[in-house]
Amino acid sequence: NFLSPLLVFISKPLKKVIMNRVTSLFGIRYPIIQGGMVWCSGWRLAAAVSNAGGLGLLGAGSMHPETLREHIRKCHEATHHAFGVNIPLMYPQIEEIMQIVADEGVKIVFTSAGSPKKWTGWLHERGITVVHVVSSSRFAVKAEEAGVDAVVAEGFEAGGHNGREETTTLCLIPAVRAVTTLPLIAAGGIATGEAMLAARVLGAEGVQIGTRFALTAESSANEVFKDYCLHL
């Protein structure tokens, strides 16, 4: 059987709500974000994670704008909790995607693959929280200057696209923490409760998990891929 949606990477279930700047920013119970993954994170997975107390993200990168609109609407129907959309900024239909996100009442946007400077103010004017994914301390500084509300420090272990720096997650977390006071979320190679604890010790206030959530029943990843990964 495939893994259940939330806390699948924590050795023992959490018995109490964890309150910090990340949980307060998103209005969630646990500082656990499900990464927005191409072909993996549709409305079923995002809603399941949000219903379980984390923050589910729709992966807009692979979606036609109208497909994204459909997933947002279905996610609204499936959960009354916060969820967000991950948007790579380099996509050619970025203007249409941003307008759909605003029109459909999404309140949290994670941006990546580009400068957040152009869109952060526009999203804030519409009451949307903005989080930017960075691969270096230099980009973290630029993200804070752009006015984002939080940053994700994504190390080279991440299964998705990341930067050219090839900095590992455990090295990147303290480097980013040293240059910004923003709420910090760690990503890249985090799949257990022990890894989550290590990230918190190094200065992260939350974690973003991709691959582990891609293997859940709610993920839209190919079943052959799930089965292969689970039996490695």
Protein language model features and the residues they cover:
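Residue-level detector of alpha-helix initiation sites
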Residues: C40, I190-A191
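Short, Lys/Arg-enriched N-terminal segments with co-localized hydrophobic residues
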Residues: N1-I18
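Active-site entrance/lid segments in N-terminal catalytic domains of soluble metabolic enzymes
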Residues: K15-P183
